[in-house]
């Protein structure tokens, strides 16, 4: 009976160890998943807020830069009178200073007074719409940057609908910037076709595409945080790691353990059956004595 008891005890010890290991793995995976999910959400929030800050600073660079066009590199494909050429240069210079540039010095060209600004709206209506969209983009960019930096304050870390509002602001900002970047070259191409000239676009315009990419990335990160994609990704990875880390012994269900115990108990009985024929009494031998 001693070997039978030893086998039963060893089987019970194995099952208890497997159960303890399963419970330990489940309990250890939950805090890790929670920490990883929260860290991913917080890192995405930090990246989105810093991207919005960089994009807003680049918008300010676009506002104060004067390199939207290169008037010195413009080429006339036909000759104009001197007064017409001067007027064309004035228009090109006003477009090269940007969409929100306001000159207050005395060295500014004569097109900066109110009458000539009205003429600019009548001659370049697309340029005027681009000014409006760029002005709205500046204001909305400031609001978005401020909104994405609010979670740094401890009292505002759990605001309702924070991710949803961030998504709406980001994609509205992307729409306004894309409209500005689309209307500015369209206005220039119309003017080039009308005056039969060619003017190269400056580096200030191409900064706008970098701003567009940054704000689009902010919108994607806000969308991922709002839809809890990080928790879904971490839950799927933890399930895969848990299934791969479990051994074949831990996959045996508890209902199968009694049958294994019964088989272990029956095996010694089967070993004891062949010992019974040794105890059979031999028949009496015939007496050979006289």
UniProtKB/Swiss-Prot annotation:
Entry keywords, A to Z: Developmental protein, Differentiation, Membrane, Phosphoprotein, Spermatogenesis, Transmembrane, Transmembrane helix
GO biological process: cell differentiation; spermatogenesis
Location within or outside the cell: Membrane
Modified residues (Phosphoserine): 28
Positions of transmembrane segments: 44-64, 125-145, 164-184, 201-221
Coiled coil: none
Chain intervals for the UniProt region annotation (Disordered): 247-290
Domain of life, per lineage: Eukaryota
Keyword Transmembrane belongs to the record: yes
Organs and tissues of expression: Expressed in testis.
Name of the featured protein: Outer dense fiber protein 4
Organism expressing this protein natively: Mus musculus
Phylogenetic placement of the source organism: Eukaryota, Metazoa, Chordata, Craniata, Vertebrata
Originating gene: Odf4
